[in-house]
Curated annotation (Swiss-Prot):
The keyword Metal-binding applies. Catalyzes the opening of the heme ring with the release of iron. Key enzyme in the synthesis of the chromophoric part of the photosynthetic antennae. This is Heme oxygenase. Pfam families: Heme_oxygenase. The gene is pbsA. The keyword Ribonucleoprotein does not apply. It comes from Porphyra purpurea (Red seaweed). One of its GO terms (biological process) is heme oxidation.
Amino acid sequence: MVSSLANELREGTTKSHSMAENVSFVKSFLGGVVDKKSYRKLIANLYFVYSAIEEEILLNKDHPAIKPIYFTELNRKTSLAKDLNYYYGPDWLNIIEPSSATQVYVNRIHNIGNKQPELLVAHAYTRYLGDLSGGQVLKKIARGAMNLSDERGTKFYDFDEIEDDKIFKNNYRSALDTIPLSDEQVQNVVAEANISFTLNMKMFEELNSSIVKIITMIIVSTVRKFTLKSILATAD
């Protein structure tokens, strides 16, 4: 077992992390360009992803590689369900469906859960630590961009059972380092974490077209307003 799986994961996914931040949808989101239609589709996709992750982690909770990082307080499925009820209504489960990229993502999670459970560590690391690290910032951006007036619609970012995000993340990283893996298995987990980033990027890329439409509408609206002002000024 290597000295620190947590360090290997952090250093081994640096490039993928940077690439994910530069996907158009993510850049637009961070820039405050978020509409409810695209956002609710993202939440729907994440519901399927987390349902798969949490199902497989539960099934493998006694596996030597999973047991150290089995923290039910991280589970997102219930929180996502509350958000989906807000955006789609009470019949949301019969309305949503995974996008093509999301289905590929979900299939992979179930596949490794059945054949190589230790690789689930990579997907848990990529998603959960990412949510804990940037969740509150993304929540603030989403609420501002979509003019949400109450706490509904962004439950995904709330970890109610975790009192201190920083302490929990440190404990999680320490738990990663206790997982009994060979050097080869560690490298496989790092490789899988990079695959996880790629799967997330493909899922985000499917949402790009909606963002492009929004930006185009904003530009057209701005141009029309400017043109109207010019016409009125000329008339005066």
